[in-house]
A protein has these predicted regions:
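Domain-core and long-helix interface of multi-subunit machines
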Residues: 13-126, 203-220, 244, 248-250
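C-terminal functional module detector
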Residues: 101-111, 116-277
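Active-site segment of extracytoplasmic enzymes that catalyze sulfate/phosphate-ester chemistry
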Residues: 1-12
Length: 277
């Protein structure tokens, strides 16, 4: 043990003998992966299953949502998985992280994905396909999929496979529709933003769903109706000099969580990619 943890054999400046070293070891990993062009995602940060007994072994990984605030430069985190998630609630921890990005306190936003603690079919009632991450890509190539993951052009969905809901459109545009941004992008506007939402489901579904529109951590509007659902909503919100973000979530026919769209009332630009991943 001494030899393996001694220089020059150690690959990390941290060891298990100096107490809790906080976020530093994880930040080192995040920084190293980013420097090499990789992506990093925090997984299951609120799960309760990390504290349990496995025969003679006691596992203790307590819920740790605070890492989303304490760490910097990670690509994103799991907004949906097989446990209760609260950090995505309006005004919650995710919105605080995104607001920090809007205010210039963070260089990168944090994107959401779906993950599954999946081991085998029907264990705990789960099936492969219950947790899905949807991608907005022009071509289904490895390069385009990874770029969408890096830049937040994705959404997360939890359902009961093969039933599903699909986010066909979530966009913010100018009133005349000439400029438009989708998840992971930023749009500069000189007037009220127009939000468009289209959600469809599997062929047999006419389920009624409930969609929440969230602006910079504040619940703005709730839309309800059967699938397929189409919404056009002009938000009477124009704040020169401010930077805001919009995101949505959906309940009832499963759960769907979008990634944010940023609106900049400060810059004379049209649409650009937010600084992601």
């Amino acid at each position: 043990t001494f030899i393996a943890n001694s220089d020059p054999f150690r690959s990390s400046p941290f060891d298990p003998y100096r107490g809790d070293q906080g976020i530093a070891p994880w930040q080192l990993l995040i920084d190293d992966v980013r420097a090499k062009g990789g992506l990093t995602f925090w997984n299951h940060v609120e799960t309760q299953s990390g504290v349990r007994e496995m025969g003679p072994i006691k596992v203790h990984t307590a819920p740790h949502p605070e890492v989303l605030d304490e760490s910097r430069g990670y690509t994103g985190f799991a907004v949906l998985y097989g446990d209760t998630v609260t950090v995505t609630e309006p005004g919650g921890l995710w919105d605080r992280v995104l607001s920090d990005y809007c205010r210039g306190y963070r260089e990168h936003p944090a994107w959401g994905i779906a993950t599954a603690h999946y081991h085998r079919e029907n264990e705990a009632g789960e099936q492969l396909g219950n947790f899905q991450t949807g991608f907005f890509v022009e071509k289904l190539t490895r390069k385009d999929v990874l770029e969408a993951l890096r830049t937040g052009r994705t959404y997360a969905y939890r359902g009961t496979y093969p039933k599903f809901a699909r986010l066909d459109e979530f966009s913010v545009s100018s009133a005349d529709g000439d400029r438009r941004a989708i998840s992971g992008e930023q749009i500069a506007l000189k007037g009220n933003p127009v939000i468009r939402i289209r959600i469809s489901g599997d062929a047999e579904s006419r389920a009624a769903v409930r969609v929440r529109l969230i602006r910079s951590g504040e619940l703005v509007k709730v839309f309800e109706g059967p699938l397929p659902l189409a919404v056009r909503y002009e938000d009477e919100y124009f704040r020169p000099g401010e930077r805001a973000f919009y995101r949505i979530d959906m309940q009832e026919h499963g759960t769907l969580v979008s990634n944010p769209i940023f609106v900049d009332y400060r810059m004379n630009l049209d649409v650009k990619q937010a600084t992601g991943g």
